[in-house]
Amino acid sequence: MTEPNPNKQTVELNRTSLYWGLLLIFVLAILFSNYIFN
């Protein structure tokens, strides 16, 4: 599978990883706040 622009693929992969990281932090923050306030 050859990509015409591998640099663009890398950028999209990094953006996806960033979104997953933010989502993970968001979920952990919700769980942590529920653990504290309960």
Curated annotation (Swiss-Prot):
Please name the HAMAP family in this protein's record: PSII_PsbL
Q: Whom does it interact with, and what assembly results?
A: PSII is composed of 1 copy each of membrane proteins PsbA, PsbB, PsbC, PsbD, PsbE, PsbF, PsbH, PsbI, PsbJ, PsbK, PsbL, PsbM, PsbT, PsbX, PsbY, PsbZ, Psb30/Ycf12, at least 3 peripheral proteins of the oxygen-evolving complex and a large number of cofactors. It forms dimeric complexes.
Kindly list the cysteine pairs connected by disulfide bridges.
none
Which GO biological process annotations does it have? photosynthesis
A GO term from the CC aspect: photosystem II reaction center
Classify the protein's membrane topology as the record does. Single-pass membrane protein
Q: What is this protein called?
A: Photosystem II reaction center protein L
Please give the InterPro entries that the UniProt record associates with this protein: PSII_PsbL, PSII_PsbL_sf
Primary place of residence?
plastid
Ordered alphabetically, the record's keywords are: Chloroplast, Membrane, Photosynthesis, Photosystem II, Plastid, Reaction center, Thylakoid, Transmembrane, Transmembrane helix
The UniProt family comment states: Belongs to the PsbL family.
The protein's job, in short, is: One of the components of the core complex of photosystem II (PSII). PSII is a light-driven water:plastoquinone oxidoreductase that uses light energy to abstract electrons from H(2)O, generating O(2) and a proton gradient subsequently used for ATP formation. It consists of a core antenna complex that captures photons, and an electron transfer chain that converts photonic excitation into a charge separation. This subunit is found at the monomer-monomer interface and is required for correct PSII assembly and/or dimerization.
Q: Which Pfam families match?
A: PsbL
Q: Where in the cell is it found?
A: Plastid, Chloroplast thylakoid membrane
Q: Where are the transmembrane segments?
A: 17-37
The scientific name of the source species is Chlorokybus atmophyticus (Soil alga)
